[in-house]
Amino acid sequence: MQDFRFPELDALLTMQDLKPEDCYTRELNPLSSPLVHVKLPSETHAKFLSQRGILVKGVYEVWGHGHTYAALVESVDAFAEKDTVVSDASLSWKIQVDAFGLKLSMEEQTARRENFRHVLPFAGPVEMKNPALTFLILEDIGVDQQKTTPDRIFFLRALAGGEKNRGRGGARDLVDAQTLKRREYIGPTSMDAEMALIMCNMALVQPGSLVIDPFVGTGSVLVPCTTFGGICFGTDIDSRVLHGKAGKSIKSNFDQYKLRVPDLIRADNSRSPLRCPHYFDAVVCDPPYGIRAGARKSGRYVDYISLLFHSFSTRLCAGQLDRAATAAGVCFLRPETN
């Protein structure tokens, strides 16, 4: 799980026709910091990371950085693009202070803001609730809780997300909005909303993408795919889960979120009835690996994981075939075993 932020970030960049290796470099120890420095061609590209990124908690423009506040203030002062923003009297603003690895008192936060009084003489008014501009002084202490001196300090302008994200328009709002706790129709194998959203991103689902879940169950994996504009299909061998019970079914979930209901087919994936080579853009599923639910089939025994790759890789569009083994064209989960 701790490495999911990089594959998802790679997928988000790929959706924008950007090469991940040209945009950022992975840290040697990715657990040491929650921050990733990404170079992007425009604010539109940056905001997309928040609009689709489930593991992206905030997107910021770097105005300055340093190991000390003296170095940080000097770096901000040298940032030429700030002048137009600072001199605009119509732009309201606020400055937040946060630290990863350390809790700061209100007095400490105020003292840190005072460092920028002279280099950032904003012409606009201060507005704490809904400012036009939100800035963040961020100290990166690291995972060593014994330290009190930051390894890095940043002065950032918020572009998207940030704070608690809820209600701020980013994709992380969907984690709460589509939680299973309030889902109309669920079962023991329904995929957690956050995980399903991540899978959707890693499968590169975009508006108009043709997506299939060969183990659709209650449709939990296809909910985010449809949310992001995918045209979805699902198959399952169990007719009971497809039809639902007590007046609730897969259709109930999609009606709940006002989404297009996927086309559903009862099918045995060991003998798939689908005859549509190079048709789908993505296969996104959670196979029945036998822990919460076992695999059901008619006919002879087969290795269903191998069958899934063999069968559905031939049904992916030609441009998606090279991603079938990298969880980008085909994305599914398997349990980790020791």
What is each residue range found by the language model?
Residues 1-51, 55, 100-101, 128-132, ...:
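Class I S-adenosyl-L-methionine-dependent methyltransferase catalytic core
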Residues 4, 82-144, 153:
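A short N-terminal interaction module
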Residues 12, 71-82, 115-119, 253:
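Residues that form generic nucleotide/phosphate-binding pockets
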Residues 44-46, 66-81, 101:
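Conserved structural scaffold segments of CAZyme catalytic domains across common CAZy folds
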Residues 54-72:
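Conserved short beta-strand edge segments in small beta-sheet-based binding/regulatory domains
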Residues 76-87, 272-278:
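Short amphipathic alpha-helix with an adjacent loop that forms part of the alpha/beta core around
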